[in-house]
């Protein structure tokens, strides 16, 4: 256990940050899952709309350094490709 006032304060701050960061990581995963679910449903318009909102969420969380920016970019790229793949067959 923390013995100094400074160590107690840092422990409190770490617990608070951990709670906040956990919530944001959960929001990140939920956003990715929502897009994947829309893609599996096969509705291109809905998937594109959900992807647009989710991409913004991924960027915000990456900017806060909750997840690495490259991880967020990788997820966005793969989800965008999947959404585009839904729209391509309909156009032909």
Curated annotation (Swiss-Prot):
Keyword Metal-binding applies: no
Disordered, as annotated region: 1-25
Listed GO CC annotations: cytosol; small ribosomal subunit
Signal peptide: none
Any one Gene Ontology BP term: translation
Top-level taxonomic group: Bacteria
Keyword Metal-binding (UniProt): no
GO molecular function, one term: structural constituent of ribosome
The entry's keywords: Ribonucleoprotein, Ribosomal protein, RNA-binding, rRNA-binding
InterPro entries: Ribosomal_bS20, Ribosomal_bS20_sf
Function field: Binds directly to 16S ribosomal RNA.
PANTHER family assigned: 30S RIBOSOMAL PROTEIN S20 (PTHR33398), SMALL RIBOSOMAL SUBUNIT PROTEIN BS20C (PTHR33398:SF1)
Family, per entry: Belongs to the bacterial ribosomal protein bS20 family.
Name used for this protein in its record: Small ribosomal subunit protein bS20
Organism: Paraburkholderia phymatum (strain DSM 17167 / CIP 108236 / LMG 21445 / STM815)
Taxonomic path: Bacteria, Pseudomonadati, Pseudomonadota, Betaproteobacteria, Burkholderiales
Gene it is expressed from: rpsT
